[in-house]
């Protein structure tokens, strides 16, 4: 059970970091 919790926290952290980086620099992706 603990493994599932730790995996969920790890995925959640990575998702938050990815979202922060993605929404911080949207022009670089939209400009082509």
From Swiss-Prot:
InterPro entries from the UniProt entry: PSII_PsbT, PSII_PsbT_sf
GO biological process, one term: photosynthesis
Main subcellular location: plastid
Highest rank taxon of the organism: Eukaryota
Chain segments annotated as transmembrane: 3-23
Swiss-Prot/TrEMBL keywords: Chloroplast, Membrane, Photosynthesis, Photosystem II, Plastid, Thylakoid, Transmembrane, Transmembrane helix
Membrane-topology annotation of the record: Single-pass membrane protein
Cell location: Plastid, Chloroplast thylakoid membrane
GO cellular component, one term: chloroplast thylakoid membrane
Function in brief: Found at the monomer-monomer interface of the photosystem II (PS II) dimer, plays a role in assembly and dimerization of PSII. PSII is a light-driven water plastoquinone oxidoreductase, using light energy to abstract electrons from H(2)O, generating a proton gradient subsequently used for ATP formation.
Complexes and interactors: PSII is composed of 1 copy each of membrane proteins PsbA, PsbB, PsbC, PsbD, PsbE, PsbF, PsbH, PsbI, PsbJ, PsbK, PsbL, PsbM, PsbT, PsbX, PsbY, PsbZ, Psb30/Ycf12, at least 3 peripheral proteins of the oxygen-evolving complex and a large number of cofactors. It forms dimeric complexes.
Record PANTHER family: PHOTOSYSTEM II REACTION CENTER PROTEIN T, PTHR36411
Similarity comment: Belongs to the PsbT family.
Protein name: Photosystem II reaction center protein T
The species this protein was found in: Guillardia theta (Cryptophyte)
This protein's encoding gene: psbT
């Amino acid at each position: 059970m603990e493994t599932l919790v730790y995996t969920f926290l790890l995925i959640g952290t990575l998702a938050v970091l990815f979202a922060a980086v993605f929404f911080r620099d949207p022009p670089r992706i939209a400009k082509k």
